[in-house]
Amino acid sequence: ICNRQGVVSDVNPYFNFCLIPGFHTPDWAKGAVMYQIFVDRFYNGDKTNDVVDGEYTYIDEHVTQVRDWNKMPASMGVREFYGGDLQGVMDKLDYLQDLGVEVLYLNPIFVSPSNHKYDTQDYDYIDPHYGVIVKDGGDVLAADDRENAHATKYIKRVVNMKNLEASNAFFAKFVEEVHRRGMKVILDGV
């Protein structure tokens, strides 16, 4: 049988998929051309919000900024950041429209330490590394330091309310522009 655990022989009903009675796919989604975007890997439109080498630790190692976009990701590539952001997606809206895209499906964009953002820490705010960093500063971690309490640059970037509010405001502007073009946005909110 197949459920949320994949193909299994020992069935636990907790993991069974369920249908929501009365749910209907919206008409706008039927037959729409959808384009899924892993924001960090799409396009770097604002270099001021890029994660920098050693900004913080994720899964016991420092994060790194990838400078060669043609480089193959490491096996633990969740710590490698290419710098893609929402400004980059906005910059490429003409290109996406020319492809015939009608719906942008964005991988998670909320505050999270990984590049894929599937381990969201705060669903109320867009991650400033994808949005806007207006208040910056602090220090990156020393080479032998793995303690995020010392990652003052990261803390300032993702905790400062001005950064969080500016990132949310930028996202609202982004969605307005997408809608102005007759397109839709779907957020992956795991």
Where do the language-model regions lie?
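Short, aromatic- and glycine-rich surface loops/edge beta-strands on solvent-exposed regions
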Residues: 1
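Acidic/aromatic-lined carbohydrate-recognition and catalytic surfaces
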Residues: 8-190
